[in-house]
Amino acid sequence: MLTKVFQSGNSQAVRIPMDFRFDVDTVEIFRKENGDVVLRPVSKKTDDFLALFEGFDETFIQALEARDDLPPQERENL
């Protein structure tokens, strides 16, 4: 099936035919290695989970990344 690509402000948009309409508010978009662009519905649970991370500022993210640089702790064998 073919559909139209058009401009919406500074973005490119695609008219999705009725047979392919989504029943969610959010979709994930990504490009596969072969160049295909894929739209995939995001479930409400996934959407809520991802929203948890929106409030983290740059300082918090840098602190998490710095933790990866810590050497492993040495502990007594059990």
Swiss-Prot record:
It holds the Pfam family MazE_antitoxin. GO terms for molecular function: DNA binding. Changing R67G: No effect on antitoxin function against VapC1. The keyword Ligase does not apply. The keyword DNA-binding applies. Induction: More highly expressed in early growth phase, expression decreases as cell density decreases. Part of the vapB1-vapC1 operon. InterPro entries: SpoVT-AbrB_dom (IPR007159), SpoVT-AbrB_sf (IPR037914), VapB_TA_antitoxins (IPR051734). Changing T46W: Now functions as an antitoxin against cognate toxin VapC1 and non-cognate toxin VapC2, forms a complex with both. Keywords: DNA-binding, Toxin-antitoxin system. Residues 3-44 form the SpoVT-AbrB domain. It comes from the Bacteria. Belongs to the VapB family. Antitoxin component of a type II toxin-antitoxin (TA) system. Neutralizes the effect of cognate toxin VapC1 but not non-cognate toxin VapC2. Forms a complex with VapC1, and a weak complex with VapC2. PANTHER family: ANTITOXIN VAPB1. This is Antitoxin VapB1. It comes from Haemophilus influenzae (strain 86-028NP).
